[in-house]
Amino acid sequence: MLRGISQLPAVATMSWVLLPVLWLIVQTQAIAIKQTPELTLHEIVCPKKLHILHKREIKNNQTEKHGKEERYEPEVQYQMILNGEEIILSLQKTKHLLGPDYTETLYSPRGEEITTKPENMEHCYYKGNILNEKNSVASISTCDGLRGYFTHHHQRYQIKPLKSTDEKEHAVFTSNQEEQDPANHTCGVKSTDGKQGPIRISRSLKSPEKEDFLRAQKYIDLYLVLDNAFYKNYNENLTLIRSFVFDVMNLLNVIYNTIDVQVALVGMEIWSDGDKIKVVPSASTTFDNFLRWHSSNLGKKIHDHAQLLSGISFNNRRVGLAASNSLCSPSSVAVIEAKKKNNVALVGVMSHELGHVLGMPDVPFNTKCPSGSCVMNQYLSSKFPKDFSTSCRAHFERYLLSQKPKCLLQAPIPTNIMTTPVCGNHLLEVGEDCDCGSPKECTNLCCEALTCKLKPGTDCGGDAPNHTTE
């Protein structure tokens, strides 16, 4: 009896000692699950990685790439319980997320340009869907646990790891953002020179050559420039910036893969020491300044389209401006407001402006798309814009057939294995301004068929109308 009584204070004392420890654990968990005005904690899940037998695994019991073991598998599946229901995230590694010659450019405090080609840039970004749920989408990073975005039964979720592993507790959030008021987010069209008329197509739309062009896999080499305000918004932390930008690129591919277009990031330039142009609240002025800078810096990196992501707010509720029908040309640029650290909202604007570059117009606010939100909607929405409307797909097809932007057919390949350019083969290659075929075939008034250079005195770039998104 005495022993039992004497133990009570010890037990009580131990309980009081444990309470602060438990409270510390709870506090640590609460800090890890940081909610925002846009996101509300939905529940905690524990993903379980399922084993998938790959063809390469059957062959040699390992996944290899150029003789080296690949850290991230080409396909993964994760099972979890969400809302009391078992779901399986079925994910495929995003192809061509980064170009093989991907570079990063920063500037020293003295303004010296420092360009590097980061080593070991094997990425961990995947896209996919909920297994057996047709209209679901997923964009997930598996670098340190599962982090990203997915939809399930038309509800948008974000998932974040509580620990740096993919099979421990993860927080799942739901979005609180409501649909934006159409009156506050309008989209207009501004023509700079007005020289480019409506797209015209020949009557023989369905010739074998054109059918092949439409069916071919298409690629866009994207070059991103981040202004000084963007750099400071991320505390000048390159790791944070890189993670955010790669998340956005993965989401961008989720969207553009629906029209068989792969978007590869071939370069990221950060104006770390100060802006190289005057970045002002007028989107139109900033666009003109960026276009001039871009035209004088074309030799920096081979790319098809460039976007400036700005950390400031533009006037009049505008969030983007792009040159229409301009892919593969020196005027293929856009400026994007990227002040808010919201990857879904940012990719909505980036994908919209890229659509204008590919010949797509705005569509009315009430246009329906399978996911409920169209990429080219004239008003911005908080929903992830997964789809292109039927009319936009038709405009894209007309743009392809009338303009035949050859750079779209070039898959990203390392420059050190590029073949010698051949003028007259209809392919835009390194060192060529244009390639319209042989002198007999060429119908491009701007292109010198014998040299594949633009003719002197021609004004074939910079005259595309601009689309502004507000």
Curated annotation (Swiss-Prot):
Keywords carried by this UniProt record: Disulfide bond, Glycoprotein, Hydrolase, Metal-binding, Metalloprotease, Protease, Secreted, Signal, Zinc, Zymogen
Induction: Induced during DC maturation and up-regulated in response to T-cell signals. In macrophage up-regulated by bacterial lipopolysaccharides (LPS). Up-regulated by 1-alpha,25-dihydroxyvitamin D3 during differentiation of primary monocyte into macrophage.
The keyword Mitochondrion belongs to this UniProt entry's keyword annotation: no
Cofactor notes: Binds 1 zinc ion per subunit.
Main location (coarse class): secreted
SMART domains: DISIN
Binding site for Zn(2+): 352, 356, 362
Tissue: Expressed highly in the small intestine and appendix, moderately in lymph node, mucosal lining of the colon, thymus, spleen and very weakly in the bone marrow. Predominantly expressed in dendritic cells (DC) of the germinal center. Weakly expressed in monocyte and highly expressed in macrophage. Absent in immature DC.
Gene3D superfamilies hit by this protein: Collagenase (Catalytic Domain), Disintegrin domain
Pfam family, any one: Pep_M12B_propep
Region entry Disordered, spans: 173-200
Active-site residues per Swiss-Prot or TrEMBL entry: 353
Domain called Peptidase M12B: residue spans: 218-412
E.C. no: 3.4.24.-
Disulfide bonds: 328-407, 369-374
Stated name of the protein: ADAM DEC1
Residues with glycosylation annotation: 61, 184, 237, 466
UniProt-listed CDD domains: ZnMc_adamalysin_II_like
Propeptide section residues: 31-205
Protein's job: May play an important role in the control of the immune response and during pregnancy.
Name of the encoding gene: ADAMDEC1
Gene Ontology molecular function terms on file: metalloendopeptidase activity; zinc ion binding
Start and end residues of each Disintegrin domain: 420-470
Cellular compartment(s): Secreted
Lineage, broadest ranks: Eukaryota, Metazoa, Chordata, Craniata, Vertebrata
Cellular component GO terms, alphabetical: collagen-containing extracellular matrix; extracellular region
